[in-house]
Amino acid sequence: YFAHFKEQEKGLPKLMIGTKWQDSQPETEIMAAKLKLKSILAWPDNENDIPSWKKKWSKAFSVGHKEVIKTSSRLAKALASYAVLIKQKIPEIYSIETDDGVIHKLHESFKDALIKDLGISDFADMIAQTIAYGLFSARTTGKEISGIETLAESIPSTNQFLRDFFSGLESLSGDGPSDLDFDDFSLYGLIEMLNEAKIGAILEEFGTQFNGGKQDPVIHFYETFLSEYDKQRRVERGVFYTPKSVVDVIVSSVHQSLIQDFNLPLGLADHSTHIVDGKAWPKVMILDPSTGTGTFLEATIELIHKTMVNHWKSEGVKKSEILDLWNNYVDNHLLNRLYGFEVMMAPYSIAHLKLGMKLQQTGYKFNSNIRLNVYLTNTLEKPAPISNWVPEFISIESSKANEAKEQIPFSIVLGNPPYSKSMTMNQWITELMKPYKQNLDEKKSDINREEWKFLRFATNLVSESEIGIVSFVINNSFLSAPTLRRLRSKLLDDFSLQIYNLHGDSNIKEKTDEGKPDANV
């Protein structure tokens, strides 16, 4: 696509927009690009504000003329621009389809098996992120994407859902009136952009740390994507980055508690078993119910790896033997104890990518049968039977998530739940929240916020376990809000509490001892 201004005999220059047609680019993609350019390249109200209109005009193109994407930041922005096009297209197709149309069927399948209250807008968002990050995941293998037909094979085996998703889409595609047309989603343009990107340099960037080790580049990539793609969604879902220092405190506190309070010398690395309902389970089963991009699970892997290496060294194991022992440990004693739930598609995909990279950095070699136990699911929804008509690639993911919710005796629940107004209201979570609401007569209450639902989910999950630890970064209002008094009372009845106040609460305008604004977490 290209644009230029044509001088007029009278008045302002005229904006001329043209396209370079390619067989692989459908008319819908061309029209979307024209609309985007027309809105961004409008003549400025203030011609003298040169920096302002230059900045606005530069947004018209995800990359410059003949520019190849070499950085994660530029790639995130380009990926977001395609995701926006896909997200806009899905409701258009939905509105003209019959109930038997592919988009209608997919929507109903996701509602039945994954997220019960999934509206068409949120569904479009999920599919857009799935496609964008699915293709990105395929490209991270280092190989170019040869085409839609072989896309599923290109996605890392650690993310079986994405592999099955694209296999399922391929089976639904075709030229018939009720088939799925990949041209409608600008996939060929997205594939071309990803293939031309310097993926090696970008992955090397992922292996480093920004700002003197203070910022994770994978998180930076995701936050750049989300800010370009949908800022409001980030606020609604309470998606915010947890500083690594805070993550490390949470994970290490759980580790130390297992050692000191539960007499497990290896802490989070312990894989001894006990009998639960007649079956042997590891005592330390770990869940992050709001996984996001996998930061807490990544820190857990780091700590467990360090613990086991030190343990083997203390036993006199030769350095040359430790790598084999670690690979065996991951296969048999780590992956089966590490779980995550995530409801948003982009962070779900990044979590798989990030955890896979972390394990590879420790020297672990994935075999083709291994997948990570991070599942796409709404933590706050009760598991329900899955209809027989739901496509297999969706039903498998949902079945695995339901199995984890219902059958696995989790003893450790950690993470940073979303801070947002109530997004999930169903009979199951409403019933579960009742102990937090007893004898509350306030007309206004924040007790239905998402973070308190996640806290209730977590405490309920571990309450029957021989070992039970919940370690969350939680809203500061927990300490003093009157409407949370029953919540605090319930926790005091059931748990031994340890509270680390990270300070820096802007809502109450905390000050330092010197009287300055507290800039802590």
Regions flagged by a language model, labelled:
Residues 123, 141, 486, 515-516:
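Extended amphipathic alpha-helical scaffold segments
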Residues 209, 213, 227-500:
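SAM-dependent methyltransferase catalytic region
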Residues 159, 165, 387-390, 513-517:
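Charged, often glycine-rich, active-site loop that binds/positions anionic groups
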Residues 2-4, 28-35, 364-373, 498-505:
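A generic structural motif
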Residues 497-521:
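Class I S-adenosyl-L-methionine
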Residues 1-2, 131, 412, 521:
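Elongated alpha-helical scaffolds
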Residues 1-49, 302, 308:
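Nucleic acid-processing catalytic cores of prokaryotic defense/repair systems
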Residues 34-303, 337, 341-347, 354, ...:
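Preference for the N-terminal adenyl/adenosyl cofactor-binding alpha/beta module
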